[in-house]
Amino acid sequence: MPVSAVVSPVQAHKTVPCHKWHAELKRHKLPVDEFSWIMYRESKCVAKAVGWNYRGDLDHTACPSGAFHRHRQCHAVKSWDMGLLQINSGHNTLTKHICGASTRSRILLQPSCNLAVAKYLYDRYGLAPWAGNSN
């Protein structure tokens, strides 16, 4: 057998992350192998993850700590990414259409909404919405 065909025990045992979400990914018809890794990179498989994007040279120190609704109103916050696949708050109209509520709410923290919006984006743009990661 050629050396290149040999798979080490470590490689053979490598599992796709975010196993607890695989059924939901399948239900939303998202490719499990790709989106499990994206989900791990973006949120570490945590449905309630929020990532803040700040303006220019500003960062979290320019904002008071506290609840989501207070932090999102901080002058330093440009946008935020929410949920398992870190959907950006700029997708407000789309989120309202698919999930019935604004990105200014916590709707994208619900896995069913987050994955439904991700499915729409994936069907139209492929993996491009997740290609860049500034964090």
Give the location of each predicted region.
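Residue-level detector of solvent-exposed, low-hydrophobicity positions
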Residues: 28, 44, 52, 59-61, ...
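Catalytic and binding regions of secreted/periplasmic enzymes and modules that target cell-wall glycans
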Residues: 10, 37, 48, 55, ...
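Extracellular/mature segments of secreted proteins
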Residues: 24-29, 52-54, 68-74, 78-81, ...
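Surface-exposed intrinsically disordered loops and tails
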Residues: 58-68
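Sequence contexts marking disulfide-bonded cysteines in secreted/extracellular proteins
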Residues: 17-19, 44-46, 62-64, 73-75, ...
